[in-house]
Amino acid sequence: MARRATGQSGGPGRGAVKGARRPELRLPPLEPFRDGELEPDGDYDSLEFREEDLTGHDGGGARFMDCALKGCVLDETRLHHARILDSALTGPRGVGTDLAEATLRDVELLDARLGGVQLHGSVLERVVIRGGKIDYLNMRKARLRDVVFESCVLVEPDFGGARLERVEFVDCVVKGVDLTEATLADVDLRGASELEIARGVDRLAGAVISSGQLLDLAPVLAAQLGVRVEG
């Protein structure tokens, strides 16, 4: 169970941006999951899912509370509208996992290897995504508050129309991000080791970037402003 959340303001010289509050998970003793198949609107409390192959399972609308998922396969797993609370997901892998309109609160997602994850319309609050690689992450119209992306690789993540508040990118690679119509507040991009914005550079109001990132983004910013650079 998550008891407290810790906030990090970034320390001296990090500016006035408000740091994300991280979850502190304290899971109770867990029982192994033995049901074999996820069920729509199922209720899963204090369970450990260890190396379960959940390919194609339908857990739409299910609630996961104080759970640990370790090394599970999530190919085309349907978790639409699921609620994942006070839980840790370690080493999940899969393509096309459907978490559209799901709620993730006080969650750690560690060392994920995922592609085409659908999180559009989802709500993430006090979530840490650390390690691993996620390709083509769909977070269109999602709401992220107190979320940290740390030491991970994000390839072409789509935050179109999303709202990001107190979101940090720490030692991670962000390639081809789409910020079209996104709203940012206290978003700290300074820790991203690589930052490439494909669309929506005009939506950076509310974010903080480093001077080096500003130089890297100069061509994109100039193109957005219609400025021609010669010589």
Where are each of the predicted segments found?
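Short glycine-rich, low-complexity segments
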Residues: 8-14
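N-terminal acidic, proline/glycine-rich, low-complexity intrinsically disordered segments
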Residues: 1-8
